[in-house]
């Protein structure tokens, strides 16, 4: 599935400096918040967030929380300690792939290289660690799915990144795609991947002070090879309280993301409360209209 790509570009120090300055200048452009094409239905968003949170529970809890009207199949551990489950509702002809993240943030950094790794099927550069995990999840999930059922995908953190690549594979295999929503998802590809898959129905949720969705950050080797990692899909930035900002594209990076990147090896997800799935779930719940119509 994954094949090697042979070359890595080198340049003189002067050329490197000019490329670096130009790239940083382009990365500094700020996207402007806008109105979403249609009002966000946070009751629906909550269905995705709850499933992404369930994925961290024990298998018995996942089965219980999912209810008796659906069939749930849970994977064993996959790459980097991740796990996934598939939920199929025969009556509604809807199926879900839910991918759990990992407790370690260092995997985002240690498997970052994409300049030598291209997925031969999708035809785009991908983050090696996320791609490896996605392939394992897809191998587990595909035999459990029906191509004519609406297929929804969700995940948090590393799991969200793998879920996006799974969504790409579903498209290539002709599945009927529903909505994909991710929470705190890092970047998975570059400009080539963005061009090819930007039309996918992907909505990314980002807590306002969560640095993880800005990873991997701008890296000189990426600018000189396939270009920097980029996001695609609309982005919803969740503030504290019932407030959010909608962007049709990824806004500029957090200024602190580079020092955060350098310190990843010393951090766990618990050290970054804005990145916790529990925090995402709480922010989504704050935006769900109450029964009183508030």
Regions from the language model: what does each represent?
Residues 28-154, 158-294:
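Non-catalytic, mobile gating and regulatory segments of ester bond hydrolases
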Residues 2-14:
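Bacterial N-terminal signal peptides that target proteins for export
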Residues 23-26:
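C-terminal motif of bacterial Sec signal peptides marking the signal peptidase cleavage site
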Residues 14-20:
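Hydrophobic helical h-region of N-terminal Sec-dependent signal peptides
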């Amino acid at each position: 599935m994954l094949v090697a790509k042979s070359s890595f570009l080198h340049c003189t120090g002067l050329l490197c400096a000019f490329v670096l300055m130009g790239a940083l200048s382009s990365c500094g452009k700020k996207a402007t918040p806008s109105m979403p094409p249609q009002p966000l239905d946070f009751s629906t968003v909550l269905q995705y967030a709850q499933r992404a949170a369930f994925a961290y529970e024990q298998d018995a809890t996942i089965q219980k929380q999912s209810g008796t009207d659906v069939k749930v199949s849970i994977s064993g551990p996959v790459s980097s300690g991740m796990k996934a489950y598939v939920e199929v509702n025969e009556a509604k002809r809807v199926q879900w792939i839910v991918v759990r993240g990992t407790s370690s943030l260092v995997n985002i950094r240690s498997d970052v290289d994409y300049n030598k790794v291209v997925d031969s099927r999708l035809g785009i550069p991908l983050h090696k660690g996320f791609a490896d995990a996605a392939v394992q999840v897809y191998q587990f999930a595909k035999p459990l799915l029906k191509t004519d059922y609406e297929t929804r995908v969700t995940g948090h953190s590393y799991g969200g990144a793998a879920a996006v690549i799974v969504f790409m594979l579903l498209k290539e295999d002709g599945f009927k795609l529903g909505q994909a929503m991710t929470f705190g998802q890092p970047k998975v590809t570059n400009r080539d991947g963005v061009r090819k898959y930007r039309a996918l129905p992907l909505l990314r949720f980002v807590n306002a002070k969560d640095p993880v969705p800005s990873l991997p950050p701008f890296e000189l080797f990426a600018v000189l090879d396939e270009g920097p990692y980029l996001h695609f899909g609309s982005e919803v930035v969740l503030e504290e309280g019932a407030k959010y900002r909608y962007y049709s594209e990824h806004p500029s990076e957090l200024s602190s993301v580079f020092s955060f990147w350098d310190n990843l090896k010393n951090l766990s997800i618990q050290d970054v409360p804005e990145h916790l799935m529990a925090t995402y779930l709480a922010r989504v719940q704050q935006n769900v209209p109450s029964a009183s119509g508030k």
